[in-house]
């Protein structure tokens, strides 16, 4: 594996994949300590990925699954805002929401809405799209 993929695929293989047949590739990687570098490697593509979801959403009449997936991607990507001294990973969507609201209390309502969309997306696609785009802009600005 290229060294440039160590913090994305290496981390993913070591901590999130289970071998079901053949060689266990996880054994080729050390345990990774939680870090911003890993968060960037795993979530750094959040804006183009979400733009892809929004494009697909505009082309379908039943986008409930896409809305749910987009909301989850965005909420998990808030891990990009972690501090260097953070020494663990959020495990649940609720933990992601709680952590980002602790750091950005002014986003409490927006993050609460996003968490709700992770479980039961609203039917109004135009409203969903507008709010998701606003949160995408906020995340993009907050991580600079």
What do these predicted regions represent?
Residues 30-144:
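Conserved nucleotidyltransferase catalytic core and NTase-mimicking acidic/glycine-rich helix/loop elements
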Residues 1-22:
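Conserved catalytic core of two-metal-ion nucleotidyltransferases
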């Amino acid at each position: 594996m290229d060294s440039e993929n160590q913090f994305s695929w290496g981390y993913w293989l070591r901590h999130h994949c289970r071998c079901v047949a053949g060689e266990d590739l996880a054994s080729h990687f050390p345990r990774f300590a939680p870090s911003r570098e890993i968060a960037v490697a795993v979530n750094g593509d959040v804006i183009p990925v979400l733009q892809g979801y929004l494009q697909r959403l505009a082309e379908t009449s039943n986008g409930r699954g896409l809305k749910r997936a987009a909301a989850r991607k965005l909420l998990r990507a808030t891990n990009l805002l972690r501090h260097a001294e953070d020494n663990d990973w959020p495990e649940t969507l609720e933990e992601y929401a709680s952590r980002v609201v602790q750091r950005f209390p002014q986003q409490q309502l927006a993050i609460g809405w996003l968490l709700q969309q992770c479980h039961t997306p609203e039917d109004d696609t135009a409203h969903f799209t507008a709010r998701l785009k606003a949160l995408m802009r906020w995340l993009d600005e907050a991580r600079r």
